[in-house]
UniProtKB/Swiss-Prot annotation:
It comes from Desulforamulus reducens (strain ATCC BAA-1160 / DSM 100696 / MI-1). GO terms for molecular function: adenine deaminase activity. Keywords: Hydrolase, Manganese. One of its GO terms (biological process) is adenine catabolic process. This is Adenine deaminase. InterPro entries: Adenine_deam, Adenine_deam_C, Amidohydro-rel, Metal-dep_hydrolase_composite, Metal_Hydrolase. The keyword Repeat does not apply. It comes from the Bacteria. SUPFAM superfamilies: Composite domain of metallo-dependent hydrolases (SSF51338), Metallo-dependent hydrolases (SSF51556). The keyword Manganese applies. Its cofactor is Mn(2+).
Length: 588
């Protein structure tokens, strides 16, 4: 779509009315994100680009589309997404995001990078050229996220990061762990310098930072942050020139608090941008994608055009692509969404590069799922000596005090507490009555066979175990359970499928979703994946769990960059202190 001289000359002749257009969309209400107005008009399209708005000459076109008075808005953009946690391949993802009006993703493939390094990223991108949406990558900056505190399958150093930043498909340096900036790790500073040299912005991950720490982070050149949970955090970031990505994922529900605050404080939305970060396929199908962020903001009282700006032109400006994306004006790519109204954001028609790609909630053409390289289908290698005893936590005495990870509803952050648990047979016991369950992370790359064991509150399981090979960002096998035998079985079932989500009860596998592509993504169409997730969520509910997205929640407990605690295969991590702490702190 960058074009050449001949193509540009052709577009100019069409713009001047000298040659026929490819497509003429007439009888529409154009939502202008520059002037924040709506006007009746038409769009002339050539070579996938808008070349004229409301021309004063009679239009000739190969195809004429009557919008029948519908509202025309620019294609929606997700400013920060990880494709892998949708559990879909990029091809399968098209069927669930494009009908909701998403035409551009800014995606950080850190998940596949942590599993398989640069060749994993390249394999993922090899199958994206002919999709009905555009992918720009946020080049993974943290592979691994916490060196020395986790085991990963792949590593991306400065050389690999610089190579990806030089590519036209990259838009930015992906989110940087604050600890690397605050401790002035030169390897990570080199990645920021590379991004600047290549004309790319650097994305942030400023979770839990105070004002003084944010000053350091902003000085390093981190340009945005998607981790604001309350309005005060968003406001502080804006004050320091850090743009705020307003997130609504499966477990990170931040739109209401942040948009409400912006409305109440009469805050300009110019530097507010929508993203999803991590959202399961079933939530996208039921709610929408970026369209859901827009609709929710409008329902909260935000001016519809401002909400649309947060999904279009604000995003394009941030990534320095507003010469090409984000508005329905001449010279921009013809990514167009037609809506019946600006209250329920449910697209009637979606155009990508001037081609009709979705209508009435369905793609106009089926997308085939590609074959992925064999190395991505062979990423799970369990420790050879793994057994139920691998999940035991030895202790002296009759009871012991342990560090516990406590969940917050609808958030990925957690808080730490210390609780007393009984000891029997020399092993620490779970307490299902108090909802204190065992948590484990099993190294799955065949490197060291390490197993980290801890405790978590918030899952409310009364029996069995849940497990996932999606566990941020290292993507080892994370398991929550009431007993060691079911936890061991869950790990083995994941290995049998070379990745997946699993539910186990009393020595029986009661549910599984295989994720053979890197242990992260399914090779099935979206409808089948959605059905299997729904079944798994019901199985989790039968075991006592009342979380709306239990497997998404489980995947974040192992993240060593989200406060307060995280569990990896190396042990329990104090996130802000960036060190391993003991699970058992006292016995008696």
């Amino acid at each position: 779509m960058l074009g050449d001289v001949a193509s540009l000359a052709e577009e100019l002749r069409v713009a001047a009315g000298q040659e026929p257009a490819d497509l003429y969309i007439k009888n529409i209400q154009i939502v202008d994100v520059y002037t924040e107005t709506i006007f009746s008009g038409s769009l002339v399209i050539k070579n996938g680009k808008i070349v004229a708005v409301n021309p004063g000459w009679e239009v000739e076109a190969k195809e004429v589309f009557d919008g029948k008075g519908r509202f025309a808005v620019p294609g929606f953009m997700d400013a920060h997404i990880h494709i892998e946690p949708t559990l879909l391949s990029p091809e399968a993802l098209a069927s669930v995001i494009v009908p909701w009006g998403t035409t551009t993703l800014f995606a950080d493939p850190m998940e596949i990078a942590n599993v398989a390094g640069l060749k994993g990223v390249e394999a993922l991108l090899n199958n994206t050229e002919n999709l009905p949406y555009q992918i720009y990558i946020e080049v993974p900056s943290r592979v691994p996220t916490a060196p020395g505190l986790e085991t990963t399958g792949g590593v991306l150093g400065v050389k690999e990061v610089d190579q990806l930043l030089q590519s036209n498909i990259s838009a930015s340096l992906g989110e940087l762990d604050p600890s690397k900036i605050l401790s002035i790790k030169e390897e990570y500073l080199a990645k920021i310098v590379s991004a600047r040299a290549n004309g790319k912005v650097a994305n942030g991950h400023a979770i839990g930072l105070n004002w003084d720490q944010l000053n350091v982070y902003a000085t390093a050149g981190l340009s945005d942050d998607h981790e604001s949970v309350v309005f005060q955090e968003l406001f502080e970031r804006l004050r320091l020139g850090i743009k705020a990505l307003v997130r609504e994922g499966s477990t990170e529900r931040n739109v209401e608090a942040l948009v409400k605050g912006a409305i109440e404080q009469n805050l300009s939305t110019e530097n507010l941008i929508f993203c999803t970060d991590d959202k399961h396929v079933n939530d996208i199908v039921r709610e929408g994608h970026i369209s859901f962020n827009v609709q929710k903001a409008i329902a909260l009282g935000l001016n519809p055009i401002k909400a649309i700006q947060m999904a279009t032109i604000n995003t394009a400006k941030h990534f320095r692509l507003d010469h090409y994306l984000g508005a329905l004006t001449p010279g921009k790519v013809a990514d167009i969404v037609l809506l019946d109204d600006l209250v329920e954001i449910k697209p009637a028609y979606v155009f990508k590069n001037g081609k009709l790609v979705a209508q009435g909630g369905k793609l106009t053409q089926q997308i085939e799922i590609s074959q992925y390289p064999a190395f991505l289908n062979e990423t799970v290698k369990l420790p050879p000596n793994l057994a139920p005893t691998s999940f035991a936590l030895p202790s002296q005495g009759n009871r012991c005090k342990v560090n516990v990870i406590n969940l917050y509803p609808d958030q990925i952050i957690n808080f730490a507490s210390q609780e007393w648990l009984n000891v029997a047979g020399g092993e620490v016991q779970v307490n299902t009555n108090e909802d204190i369950l065992k948590l484990a992370v099993v190294e799955r790359y065949g490197k060291n066979g390490s197993v980290g064991v801890g405790f978590v509150r918030g899952f409310k399981l009364k029996a069995g175990a849940l497990a996932s090979s999606v566990s941020h960002d290292h993507h080892n096998i994370v398991i929550v359970g009431t007993n060691d035998q079911d936890m061991d079985l869950a790990a083995r079932e994941i290995a049998r499928h070379q990745g997946g989500l699993v539910a186990v009860e009393n020595g029986q596998v009661i549910g599984v979703l295989p994720l053979p592509i890197g242990g992260l993504m399914s090779s099935l169409p979206a409808e089948q994946v959605m059905s299997q997730i729904d079944q798994l969520n019901k199985k989790a509910e039968q075991l006592g769990c009342d979380l709306p997205a239990p497997f998404m929640t489980l995947s974040f407990i192992s993240l060593p960059t989200v406060p307060e605690l995280g569990l990896t295969d190396c042990g329990l991590i104090h996130v802000l202190e960036h060190r391993i702490i003991p699970t058992v702190v006292e016995t008696e």
